[in-house]
Amino acid sequence: MNRPIKFRACYLPTLKMFDMEDLIHEEHLLDMLTMVNGKSKEDFSPLMQFTGFYDRNGKEIFEDDIVEIRNHPFDRFIGIDGMYRVGYSDRMEICCGSWLLHHVLPYATVVGNMYQHPHLLGGTEDE
C-alpha cells in the first residue's frame, strides 16, 4: 500500500492535536525526548501514524482514533456494530478492535480519538 507518511500527537494538558509540521522546527525534527516548542515530551501522547485509510466520510484514520461501525450487514449475526480503537494487531495488521480495518471501512466513521474522547470507549475524561 502506497500512502503518505503522516504523524500527529496530542498535547495532553490542553488536548490539542499537533500534526507533524507543528512538531518540526527549521527543517529538523525536534528532540522528542526533551522539549517540543517549549513543552515537555511527557505532556504529549505517543505519536499516532496515519493508517492510509479513510472513513466513509473521507476523513483520515490514524492510530488511536476511535471509529464507530454502524449498519454492518453481519451485525445481526455476530454483533459488529460499536465503537473501536484503531491500532495494530500482534501480526501488525491495522485493526479496529479485533476486526481488520479494511474489511469494515464502508461502515466506519471516525468519532474521536482515545486521548480527547476516552469516554467513547467506556473510559473517563480524566484518563
Predicted feature descriptions by range:
Residues M1-E127:
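Secondary-structure transition motif
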